């Protein structure tokens, strides 16, 4: 996979070059192409923004440098703009994007984009109901969530499958040594060696976490008979 990023601040993307994603870059499992669209301006001062028509505070990013930067790419793939009005990014989107050969992100800054820039994109995406100074941090979050799903990026291929949201539930609690820390003990089932019981416990605890912390996720989920039984047990245990 090749990911292009149009940004005024390419140095902000250094964190993607460390840890597992960084090793993936070194091993050529994915490619990151940072494009500073200031390089595509035509005036001597390299302006990328201007005052808004109709007046108002702030500066608006111009379409021409961004359009020229996009046109310079040989393989754009899906073009994504990060903006507060976009649909909220989620794990399903990361899974879909991870199947693409090319992705291109456009990072905004200042007051925002000239409205015509949105017509250059296939999707407008947000990471939440809050405003940041630019689109670089949301873009890095989405790249991380997407690239980690590529084959060979994570050491354990089962990891992305078992994590939160992958099956529409939050992740079950996890423990490691010591088995007893100041009286707080690891659930006995996890040390029993009974893989079926462990799987059942994890499923129920994932359901419990989702019910307690993200009940909205259950509203869209078609529960199996076993999950309905587990959920009734969870509700009963909560009441008691």
From Swiss-Prot:
Binding annotation for S-adenosyl-L-methionine: 108, 127-132
Key words, A-Z: Cytoplasm, Methyltransferase, S-adenosyl-L-methionine, Transferase, tRNA processing
Location within or outside the cell: Cytoplasm
GO biological process: tRNA N1-guanine methylation
EC number, as in UniProt: 2.1.1.228
Catalytic activity from the UniProt record: guanosine(37) in tRNA + S-adenosyl-L-methionine = N(1)-methylguanosine(37) in tRNA + S-adenosyl-L-homocysteine + H(+)
GO molecular function (one): tRNA (guanine(37)-N1)-methyltransferase activity
CDD domains recorded: TrmD-like (cd18080)
Position of the signal peptide: none
Alphabetized InterPro entries for the sequence: Alpha/beta_knot_MTases, tRNA_m1G_MeTrfase_C_sf, tRNA_m1G_MeTrfase_TrmD, tRNA_m1G_MTases_N, tRNA_MeTrfase_TRMD/TRM10
GO CC entries: cytosol
Gene3D superfamilies: 3.40.1280.10, tRNA(m1g37)methyltransferase, domain 2 (1.10.1270.20)
Origin: domain of life: Bacteria
Purpose of the protein: Specifically methylates guanosine-37 in various tRNAs.
Self-association state and partner proteins as the record states: Homodimer.
Similarity annotation: Belongs to the RNA methyltransferase TrmD family.
Record's protein name: tRNA (guanine-N(1)-)-methyltransferase
Protein source organism: Lactobacillus johnsonii (strain CNCM I-12250 / La1 / NCC 533)
Lineage: Bacteria, Bacillati, Bacillota, Bacilli, Lactobacillales
Gene: trmD
